[in-house]
């Protein structure tokens, strides 16, 4: 699990042999549908919320269905191509997040919960002669959503134009909930940018961007829909 379980009192990870087999089949046939498993994660999350509704809690949902192009056949709105499967997965996970928000409202937790929605990368579908992620730094791969839902309403919703990185998440969350900052964080708190945007002022400039070269060779085998790494 890449160490994701560190520090958690309860850690659950769904595993499906049927899902793994479907992933193998999809290497030769991009139209093979993967059944989404994030619904199981959501059910466990709601159960956790019900059990801890009267306590302070930290709940982390690592939803992987979009990463795997997996979805429920009850929700697809697009076609069956490779990129359509990705869109179907986004629609599926979006519906699950709607259920999560509904559960928070039902349990009376929404007005005292900070919600953070983030992603670690986008996905390329040939926009710059590449597919997937982790192979270039074009916008389709590096631009990701970051949505902060505080336990109070901001009217209208604030859009922060300043560039941010995922290493900024922890410093931002800690400041928003009133906890001490990390001693030597890699990122910075985005609260100054949020406050500036809320006040209609210019947002502070962030640090510069550094790029790393990944010494891997990528190629495509005839007849296979996905690139391979050498």
Q: Where are the predicted features?
A:
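Catalytic domains that recognize anionic headgroups
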Residues: 1-230
């Amino acid at each position: 699990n890449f160490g994701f379980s560190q520090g958690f009192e309860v850690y659950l990870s769904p595993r499906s042999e049927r899902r793994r087999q479907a992933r193998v089949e999809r290497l030769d046939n991009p139209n093979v549908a993967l059944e989404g498993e994030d619904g199981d994660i959501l059910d466990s999350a709601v159960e956790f919320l019900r059990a801890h509704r009267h306590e302070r809690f930290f709940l982390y949902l690592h939803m992987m269905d979009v990463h795997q192009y997996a979805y429920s056949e009850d929700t697809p709105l697009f076609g069956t191509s490779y990129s359509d499967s990705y869109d179907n997965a986004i629609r599926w996970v979006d519906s699950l997040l709607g259920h999560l928000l509904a559960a928070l409202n039902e349990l009376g937790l929404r007005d005292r919960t900070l919600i953070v929605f983030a992603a670690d990368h986008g996905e390329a579908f040939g926009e710059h002669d590449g597919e997937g992620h982790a192979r270039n730094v074009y916008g389709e791969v590096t631009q990701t959503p970051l949505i902060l839902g505080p336990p109070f309403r901001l009217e209208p919703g604030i859009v922060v134009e300043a560039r941010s990185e995922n290493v900024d998440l922890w410093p931002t969350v800690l400041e928003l909930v009133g906890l001490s900052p990390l001693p030597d964080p890699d990122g910075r708190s985005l609260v100054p940018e949020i406050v500036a945007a809320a006040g209609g002022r210019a947002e502070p400039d962030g640090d510069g961007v550094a790029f790393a070269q990944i010494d891997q060779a990528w190629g495509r085998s005839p007849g296979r829909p996905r690139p391979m790494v050498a």
